[in-house]
A protein has these predicted regions:
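C-terminal hydrophobic helical "lid"/dimerization subdomain
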Residues: 1-4, 184, 283-333
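N-terminal Rossmann-fold cofactor-binding loop
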Residues: 192-196, 255, 279
Length: 333
């Protein structure tokens, strides 16, 4: 039995420090958490009595605490985990590398409410943790576990090619990573933002083109967009964006929202446009994302906070106010 400190949400929306006790099963690994990213999804669960956080990074603990059936990790290995914790491993989706769509998938917010990455330790199935490349410090690896995996999966899994033009709406926690990944994939990257305030930063991250949208009736771009990643917490003005989509282009809503997707009908029909759902990356794609980030030196831009009640609340407040540049990272003691 292992006992460790965790940080939970509450009905009042306050962060509560608590304790979790868990046994380590034969196929599980005990991880000393060193860093956790703060994702916008965490905001949606802060009023629930559950341990928060799903962008974890840490170190595998001493060998006698590693599950008896685990042979892939050893003491001191740098590892991370993300949104998914388990699947059935025998359905069609699991057997074809799409375990994120498994009917029995275990996902953050819906399963394992007694632990998360806002904690000093975590115990996860070895099959659902990921080895972090030595060249990526864990403070940068943590936000990649969900934010990086989300944008990489959209770019990687739906036939994006280096010759394609990728549009990215919003330069926040997801958008600033999407710019880097799309640029390093060889795509022409057009960034859309309401104002000019983040233009210089977007260009430094790898954007080829920057377009402001506020007060503009018709967007002017150098070429039609093949893939449009929506990385804002609100739906864009589709009357602005649908006219700049290439025939057969794809729209990717990537942020969590409880609102209905409302979009003009005829432009979708006439342009043979697609609206493509994209969850987080399956394990093979997740590992590929980490290797790609290591090879191309992709790093999130982060702000650090202590992993305490006060630190977590300050981090979440800054994100809520829209002032985070661009991913908050909690540092465990």
């Amino acid at each position: 039995m292992v006992e460790f400190t965790v940080f939970k949400g509450s009905r009042e929306g306050k962060i509560v420090q608590s304790t979790t006790k868990k046994d380590i099963k034969s196929d599980e690994v005990l991880i000393k958490v060193t860093h956790s990213g703060l994702c916008g999804t965490d905001e949606h669960f802060k009023r629930i009595d559950m341990v928060l956080g799903h962008e974890g990074a840490g170190v595998v603990e001493f060998s006698q605490e590693i599950g008896a059936a685990v042979t892939t990790y050893a003491k001191g290995d740098s590892v991370g985990w993300g949104y998914q914790h388990d699947s059935c491993n025998h359905c069609k989706q699991c057997l074809t590398g799409h375990e994120t769509l498994c009917p029995e998938r275990a996902m953050y917010g819906y399963h394992d409410h007694d632990q998360g990455s806002f904690a000093y330790y975590a115990i996860w199935k070895a099959d659902y943790i990921f080895r972090i490349p030595d060249s990526i410090p864990r403070e940068f690896a943590a936000p990649l576990q969900c934010g990086g995996a989300t944008v990489y999966n959209a770019l990687r899994s739906f036939d994006t090619k280096p010759s394609h033009r990728v549009g990215i709406i919003g330069i926040g926690g997801l958008g600033h990573l999407a710019i880097q990944f799309a640029s390093k994939m060889g795509c022409h990257v057009t960034v859309f933002s309401s104002t000019d305030s983040k233009r210089d930063e977007a260009m430094k991250l790898g954007a080829n083109e920057f377009v402001t949208t506020k007060g503009v009736k018709e967007l002017q771009v150098s070429g039609k967009i093949d893939h449009l990643l929506i990385c804002t917490s609100f739906q864009p003005d589709w009357k602005q964006f649908l006219p700049i989509m290439a025939p057969g282009g794809t729209l990717y809503p990537l942020t969590v929202s409880q609102d209905d997707l409302t979009i003009p009908y005829m432009p979708i029909l006439e342009g043979e446009l697609k609206v493509q759902g994209s969850l987080v990356a399956a394990r093979a794609v997740h590992n590929e994302m980490l290797a790609f980030a290591a090879q191309h030196q992709i790093r999130p831009l982060i702000e650090k906070f202590p992993m305490t009640v006060e630190g977590i609340e300050a981090c979440m407040k800054k994100l809520e106010e829209g002032n985070m540049r661009y991913r908050g990272v909690l540092i465990a003691p």
